Amino acid sequence: MELDLDGGRLVVFVGGLLLFLFIESLFPARNWQGNRARRLFFHGSVAAFNTVLVRVFIYVPFLLWVVFVEQQGWGISRWLGLDGWLEIVLSLIALDAFDYFWHRANHRVPFLWRFHKAHHADNEMDVSTALRFHPGELVLSSLAKASWVLVWGPTPIAWFVFEGMISLCAQFHHSNIDLPD
């Protein structure tokens, strides 16, 4: 694959995190009650552990899976003959729809909620909350997404764009930024 999707994904993730941390420090919606440095260290540690887990055991095999599915011509998008911008846009819609229903399932299915509630256990929400996930949730989520990749069949670039967008959206949604009325 010509594009360095893995490196690009990391740049988008870290760049978004730093941007929202900076904006939060300038325009906080709520004053901090606890020690922010300690909180950022904790969430950063969770993220570091999860990054190793995800990168080694999930992300690389997953990206290879996306490439394999595309090469085999599997998935609805392949069967419809989608390509170019149309494939990317429709893949974003399809993957986002899956992500929405997966997130709803994490709140409604007791087994999934056991893992997802670690994310909701945060007492003060800020951009670092977007880093707080139970490793079990990451594994289960990746398995669910792998099945959806098989069904839909996005191209690797569509997958990369989706992962970047969902990461930036999650960081924004969790940010402690005072937005104007």
Question: Which residues does each PLM region occupy?
Answer:
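Helix-boundary and loop/linker segments of multi-pass membrane transporters
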Residues: E2-D6, Q33-A37, S77-G84, A118-H119
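Loop-to-helix transition at the N-terminal end of transmembrane alpha-helices
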Residues: G8-R9, N35-A48
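Hydrophobic transmembrane alpha-helical segments in integral membrane proteins
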Residues: M1-G15
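Membrane-interface helix termini and inter-helical loops of multi-pass transporters
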Residues: V66-W79
